[in-house]
Each structure stands twice: as structure tokens, then as C-alpha cells.
Amino acid sequence: MSFVATQTVRRLLGASFAFVLACSSLQSYAHGDVVPHSVDTSTLPQLGEKWLDANPYSTGPANKEALRIGASAYNQNCARCHGLEAISGGISPDLRKIDNDCTELADEAKKNACYQEINEYFVATVRRGRARDGRVYMPPFEGILSQEAIWSIKTYLETRRER
């Protein structure tokens, strides 16, 4: 093989390697920054250390502000897995449907008990994450997201319910 042919082959191999490396690095960033982001909830009524059983922002004067903060917090911390606007791509649970079973109940006491159970499940999952067989399916956000931030995200998801 001539010197020119050898140099050409080396350049092609080098360019191919660089292309593959560039593409693989783009793939690793496909879901964006994976570092969880804290959320500024200073404009919301503070809830204290004890975790509440029900979403204090579902109704009332803080609802609109909680919705604004929750939408931003969701997009920063949840959308990479659960989808933009809470529309899942099929890999992670579709959070628009988290309390669908509750909304269909006619008995008000059963409906309230169902919402209570969903709230407990939601908060526990966000705080502690979910793992099975040594695999992390959802990272824990305890110490990163405050109670106010988590309830704000839940407020946002309540407006995204699929009916």
C-alpha cells in the first residue's frame, strides 16, 4: 500500500472514530442535565417540617402560584423521564393518570380516601424514589425538593389530568 493510500485510510478511520464519538456523546445528553434542581418556593405559604397528608395547594389562594412553581419544577426535574407536559413517552408512568381511579368514584367518602392514598403514594415515591432488584427506576428527591415543591408539582399534575 502506498504512503498516500495509508494516510487516506488513517484519516478516514480517524474521521469515522470522531463521528462515532460525537454521536455517542450526544446520545448521552439526549435527556438533558440529569442533576436535580432545587426549586424556589419562597412565594408560597411555608408548610413546616411535618409532612402533610393532603395537597394544601389544590385549592385556595396559593393555588395559582403553586401551579406556576409546580410547572417549572416539573419541567426541571420530572419531564426528562415522565415527558413534557406530563405526557409520558411510554417508559415511565404517565402522571396524568395517577388518580384517574379516584375521579370516577361516585361515593364521596371513597373518593376522598382514594385521593388520600394517591397523595401518600406520590409523596413517598418522590421523596424516597423507587428501586427493584437493585435497579433504580426513580431517584429519590428527599433533601432536594421541599414539601412545598413536591406539593406544587402535584398541583401542576392535577391540572394535567387525562379525562
State where each predicted segment sits.
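Bacterial N-terminal signal peptides that target proteins for export
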Residues: 2-16
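Hydrophobic alpha-helical targeting segments used for export or membrane insertion
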Residues: 17-22
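N-terminal signal peptide c-region/cleavage motif recognized by signal peptidases
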Residues: 25-27
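Axial heme c-ligation environment in periplasmic c-type cytochrome domains
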Residues: 30-39, 89-98, 125-161
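Electrostatic cytochrome c docking/interface patches
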Residues: 35-73
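Gly/Gly-Pro-rich "capping" loops immediately C-terminal to redox-active cysteine motifs
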Residues: 67-71, 83, 87-127, 137
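The canonical Cys-X-X-Cys-His
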Residues: 70, 74-84, 138, 153-157
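Short sequence/structural segments immediately N-terminal
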Residues: 73, 162-163
